[in-house]
């Protein structure tokens, strides 16, 4: 940090297993990725190349190398995994990840329907090739999953070998754990947390109000994802009480 301030909550140090910030890169150029890393690197843990953008990104290898040079793991969005799966190209997906040096993989079923046991089978297979994040929740706002089912799915996917379960929100933050307005389904979140360890959940929270909710609920070391590159420093400031929304949250406290 650039100067000394007392009563700042202690953030877990990188490489960390909780307090993760996952950034969604929806199409940064190589130069933009370099510029982003020059300021964002200390506060970014994982970068996701959103949905299928990796298929159409020029100079993909060069961009991946930028993130690699900062020891930031990158993974392809779960929609790309589903695109391979629906075309019966699961083995090709593994090959593509290997060819591009991708060791983090997302397993999701937000756009397609597959039996849950089959999804868990893919998680188990991919753990042999790297770190697996599995996403729970539908991208269809009309598809409401009851809390007990969220818990059941998350538990099974963690047991299958997922390092984290991602709570679906899309890049807009208006499905899954959120209502169409972006408001948090608080009852759902709190019920999930009675059964699933918070440090194993990566909450997609693209909106500031959503990030604030989880920081207030779980502290500065909550795992948050789908953060825009331009929002990394604002989020880090909010995590440690240096933004108006959380200014008083950690004052007179030893730890977050």
Regions found by a protein language model. Give the residues of each.
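Active-site mouth loops of central-metabolism enzymes
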Residues: 17-31, 50-53, 75-89, 135-149
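Hydrophobic faces of well-ordered beta-strands that scaffold small-molecule active sites
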Residues: 18-24, 44-49, 74-78, 105-107, ...
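Active-site-adjacent beta->alpha loops and helix N-cap segments on the catalytic face
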Residues: 29-31, 54-67, 83-92, 110-130, ...
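Catalytic cores of alpha/beta
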Residues: 35, 89-95, 145-159, 206-220
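Glycine-rich phosphate-binding active-site loops on the catalytic face of alpha/beta enzymes
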Residues: 49, 106-111, 159-174, 221-238, ...
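Acidic (Asp/Glu)-rich catalytic clusters
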Residues: 34-42, 58-71, 92-101, 121-129, ...
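Conserved N-terminal beta1-alpha1 strand-loop-helix module at the mouth
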Residues: 1-66
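C-terminal alpha-helical cap/extension of soluble enzyme domains
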Residues: 3-7, 191-256
């Amino acid at each position: 940090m650039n100067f000394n301030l007392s009563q700042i909550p202690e953030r877990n140090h990188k490489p960390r297993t909780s307090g993760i910030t996952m950034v969604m890169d929806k199409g940064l150029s190589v130069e933009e990725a370099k510029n982003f890393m020059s300021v964002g690197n200390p506060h970014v843990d994982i970068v996701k190349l959103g949905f299928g953008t990796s298929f159409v990104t020029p100079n993909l290898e060069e961009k991946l190398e930028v993130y690699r040079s900062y020891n930031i793991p990158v993974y392809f969005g779960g929609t790309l995994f589903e695109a391979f799966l629906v075309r019966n190209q699961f083995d090709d997906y593994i090959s593509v990840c290997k060819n591009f040096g991708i060791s983090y993989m997302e397993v999701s079923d937000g756009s397609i329907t597959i039996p849950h046991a089959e999804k868990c089978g893919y998680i188990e297979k991919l753990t042999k090739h790297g770190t697996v994040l599995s996403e729970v929740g539908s991208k269809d706002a009309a598809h409401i999953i009851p809390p007990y089912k969220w818990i059941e799915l998350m538990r099974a996917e963690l047991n299958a070998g997922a390092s984290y379960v991602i709570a679906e929100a899309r890049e807009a933050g208006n499905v899954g754990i959120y209502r169409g307005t972006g408001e948090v389904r608080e009852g759902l979140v709190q019920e999930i947390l009675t059964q699933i360890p918070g440090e194993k959940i990566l909450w997609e929270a693209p909106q500031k109000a959503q990030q604030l909710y989880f920081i207030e609920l779980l502290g500065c070391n909550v795992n948050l994802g789908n953060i825009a590159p331009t929002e990394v420093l604002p989020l880090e400031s909010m995590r440690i009480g240096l933004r108006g929304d959380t200014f008083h949250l950690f004052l007179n406290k030893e730890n977050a």
